Amino acid sequence: MKIEYLGHSCFRITDENGVSLLTDPYSGVGYELPPRLCADIVTVSHGHFDHNATHLVKAEKVINAVGMYETNGVKVVGIPSYHDEKYGALRGENVVFKWEMDGLTICHFGDLGEPCNASLVEKIGKTDILLIPVGGRYTIDAKGAKQFVDAIAPNIVIPMHYKPADGTIDITDAEEFLGFFDGVLRVGDAPVHITADEVTKGRKIIFMERKH
């Protein structure tokens, strides 16, 4: 599969058959999505402007709620969670999305803010590739993200929702989170290609940057 990081919490993941899933399209974060974006499936973790700009993406199917879905041969599960450490009292609910492509399970945390807990970890279950926020303030921070990584034990971890070098959004960069791990693979703004064989080689932390 091919993983492209488009900034903030937005990725486009394309399987070997050409089916694409795009997560949390954004607006109003100080930089813009690439123009003329297309995807077969779009997931939206919650209704805030920096995660639900579906009008900027040409998509066949938008999924924005808890539940089980199947479209274009991809099974998607929306898992209930919360946007803040007070379990929704501050910023409401959030949907963690998990799906399978090319025999691998991918989990996107959206704007998860609730602390690591056994109930949510159990609902998420086995995960090969974890896309996780690390910037704090509106989501879990670096330490909170590390706790989830330790609890879920994914094979590949890609941080998101951090302040980029040219960003103005009031969250932190990814360096504290990356500092918890050895051998971080920094790929710049290049897409990442992952096969099932790669996930058997031990945990890998991949730091992706938005293409300017």
Predicted regions and their residues:
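Pre-active-site segment of Zn-dependent metallo-hydrolases
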Residues: 10-47, 51-66, 77-94, 112-123
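Beta-strand-turn-beta hairpins that frame and shape the catalytic cleft
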Residues: 1, 15-20, 69-77, 100-106, ...
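Binuclear metal-ion centers of metallo-dependent hydrolases, dominated by the metallo-beta-lactamase
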Residues: 4-6, 90-91, 156-212
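Active-site-proximal loop/helix segments of hydrolase catalytic cores
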Residues: 86-152
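Conserved acidic residues
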Residues: 39-40, 128, 155
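Short secondary-structure boundary segments
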Residues: 46, 134, 160-162
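Short gly/pro/ser/thr-enriched loop/turn and capping motifs at secondary-structure boundaries
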Residues: 50, 138-139, 163-167
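P-loop/Walker A phosphate-binding loop and immediately adjacent motor/lid segment at beta-alpha junctions
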Residues: 3-9, 54-80, 88-90, 146-160, ...
